[in-house]
């Protein structure tokens, strides 16, 4: 959210918990939408409405599954869907007619692999992100800290989907 905002994007956050999504507004999101239908309206319809019918230019998708399916239907012509993961448990599958007809790209994003294959550009990217963080533009939100001997509880906390932002395990 913070990076998109810094780059001048109108950030539309999506998720399954309105309580958690409200926090994204503090981080700079312009809007937030629930990914499940609300009053019979899907989030793809809401994205289209918020973008004057055009759709999103870039979609950052760490979820996959149904969210990816809907994302393909609300991406703008020439847009990019960034596949960052599949926390839904269902790996995204794209019928190739969708990007052909709508003229969008699907890009797999693996920061570590990118840095390994192109170390110079990888370092440039890390340096740029670090600079933004050093300047105060990117501030990670840590919702809860656990001691090292509480690591099991930290994992349970994540599995129970209680976190908003990041969980930190600290060594004292």
Regions found by a protein language model. Name each.
Residues 1-37:
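Mid-domain Rossmann-like dinucleotide-binding core that forms the NAD(H)/NADP(H) cofactor-binding site
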Residues 7, 24, 66-137, 170-172:
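Glycine-rich phosphate-binding loop and adjacent beta-alpha segment
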Residues 12-18, 60-65, 141, 145:
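Glycine-rich beta-to-alpha transition loops that act as phosphate-gripper elements at the mouths
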Residues 29, 55-56, 151:
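Local beta-strand N-terminus motif with an aromatic residue
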Residues 40-53:
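Short amphipathic alpha-helix with an adjacent loop that forms part of the alpha/beta core around
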Residues 59-60, 82:
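N-terminal Rossmann-like NAD(P) cofactor-binding module of classical short-chain dehydrogenase/reductase
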Residues 130-131, 135-144, 152-172:
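C-terminal capping/lid region of NAD(P)-dependent oxidoreductase domains
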């Amino acid at each position: 959210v913070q990076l998109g905002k810094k780059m001048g994007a109108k950030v539309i956050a999506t998720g399954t918990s309105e309580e958690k999504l409200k926090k994204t507004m503090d981080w700079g999101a312009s809007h937030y939408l629930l990914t499940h239908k609300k009053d019979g309206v899907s989030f793809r319809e809401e994205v289209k409405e918020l973008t004057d019918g055009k759709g999103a230019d870039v979609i950052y998708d760490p979820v996959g599954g149904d969210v990816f399916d809907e994302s393909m239907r609300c991406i703008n012509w020439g847009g990019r869907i960034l596949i960052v993961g599949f926390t839904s448990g269902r790996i995204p599958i794209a019928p190739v007619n969708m990007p052909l007809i709508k003229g969008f790209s699907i890009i797999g994003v693996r920061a570590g692999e990118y840095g390994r294959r192109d170390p110079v550009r990888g370092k440039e990217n890390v340096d740029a992100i670090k600079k933004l963080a050093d300047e105060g533009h990117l501030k990670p939100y840590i919702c809860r800290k656990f001691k090292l001997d509480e690591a099991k509880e930290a994992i349970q906390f994540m599995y129970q989907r209680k976190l908003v932002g990041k969980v930190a395990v600290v060594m004292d």
